[in-house]
Amino acid sequence: MERQDRNQIIMLGTGYATATHCYNTCFILKTPDTMLLVDAGGGNGILNQLEEAKINLSDIHSFLFITHAHTDHILGVVWVVRMIASLIKSGKYNGTFTVYGHEKALKVLEWICRMTLPAKFTSLIGTSVLLHEVKDKDELSIGDIKLQCFDILSTKEKQFGFRALLPDGTTLACLGDEPYNENNKNYVENADWLLCEAFCLYKDRDIFKPYEKHHSTALEAGALADKLNVKNLLLYHTEDKSLATRKANYTGEAAQNFKGNIFVPYDLETINI
């Protein structure tokens, strides 16, 4: 992939867990010198998304962050590990590949890999493929990106988000795929960018039932962005029944509460940040 001088978010997928008309939510956070893959969706569709985005696996040099162990976020990671292990074995990948995640996410990933991948690949775990456990409040330097990790305090599944400081001073807060918890205010408030789930439109809440699934709506995401004084709001992890009108309708609903910039990307869309 050609070097870019701007920071970018490359949305590989934007859909919720059972989406069939778009890929599950995952993205690349890219600076001029670092490419961080955040989650990988629910299967080997991640390989197609990377190919469509013209990103070689060798471009994702060293870094992947898993928010949590749900199938639509972690199973694609197994495929990324498999393919990178193959590149390492064939001498086409230099250095190590590090997967960051909390204890449970890494435990699940390692178990699936060891139960399903050939020994020639799993033998690399711990040497060339490194599983780096992060804890609540940990601070990391991933390439030229500085991350502050935080437990989103989910009551459904242990999940971590992060606040990223990019080399030009831009700040980005990722809440994973569940609603904001007030205990994490310091990580999110005044961020330049907020990445937030919006399961559906508020007007469609009786159809998609976001609240019983620990999710929220575009209307509430807009209110959150306004409350936390962020500059730019990016919505993801949505239903996939309204893709033709999603960008306009989700933007319009979030804008009822938030006057900053709102982005509702399609799969494979790149946003300059």
Identify the meaning behind each predicted range:
Residues Y93-K158, P167, F263, D267:
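Metallo-beta-lactamase
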Residues A17, T71, V99, A105-L106, ...:
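Short histidine/acidic/glycine/proline-rich micro-motifs that form metal-
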Residues E2-A53, K158-D177:
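Conserved beta-strand hairpin/beta-sheet module of binuclear metal-dependent hydrolase folds
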Residues A19-H21, E133-K203:
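Active-site-proximal loop/helix segment associated with metal-binding centers of metalloenzymes
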